């Protein structure tokens, strides 16, 4: 919805906000008007934070979690069990598990799910690096925490077969309703799903 | 909700998004992760749009609508009836009326409502400029389109008394439910409210 009554710099800004996920035209307008009301220093800080996060945040060399250093804070944390790896599709899933405060191991973020429909094969995901990581160090258990869907199940089975020769592979329990997004599941359900994980090999 | 697992530039960016109206911690996280996935050029454009809108968008000298020039596009538009002024509290209310596509006159944005509880007196609003504008030029009618609330009614009565010597003053009909925000009322209701306006003097 473009209105002739917006002045150009404002309509441009609203256009940017409309591209964000879950932001409709009215929310975009509200956010843009909010920006105009802020002191200039706040907007400069925000603008710098955007560029800084975008250029400085990369992937952990070990687990592919987001980090601004070589290794992420979870991989560097000696309090966490480095022999227990939880495999997730995306960083947002890792953050959801962290909110559940149930898991004390480390992660491996594969970057998506195998999906022939979207031409996403295993070679596009961080699966080879996972196999390498597991084969090179002593790992007690791999927990697969992927969304319960056709793609999630396919990916779980694929990784399960590859890792079976090296270590124990489990999958978090089907406590999650089918088709739901891991990101939005409540903490208690996620904790239950971790507890009730079942053996795959 | 601050998580130790966010890397600093990311948590800083999330913090900025959390300050936006109507954006909670999870939406802020989703928006920040979305930013990281965008190409750098998009983020540079967005960052520039923020600064440009903030520094270039000011107030119209005539009606105090947002504009990047001296006079806003509505005031400069010769197709619009310059003798019919609609008084609104905020720019977002003006935009809501524009969406209703019912009003063909011009506006005066007073910048808020009289509210003794919040120490907002008439002198903090663009009411003096409105009286001056009405007294200096030939105006057929002033339509007051303020939120139906104690503050809105007070402001309407105050402006109504001040302008009565100069011209006809009307108020949009009470078709709006009490306590609602003008910004969120649907277009049809707004159009009805404009049609059914009543005489104040």
Curated annotation (Swiss-Prot), chains A, B:
GO terms for molecular function: DNA binding; zinc ion binding. It comes from the Bacteria. Residues 83-177 form the Toprim domain. PROSITE patterns: RECR, TOPRIM. May play a role in DNA repair. It seems to be involved in an RecBC-independent recombinational process of DNA repair. It may act with RecF and RecO. Belongs to the RecR family. This is Recombination protein RecR. It comes from Prochlorococcus marinus (strain MIT 9215).
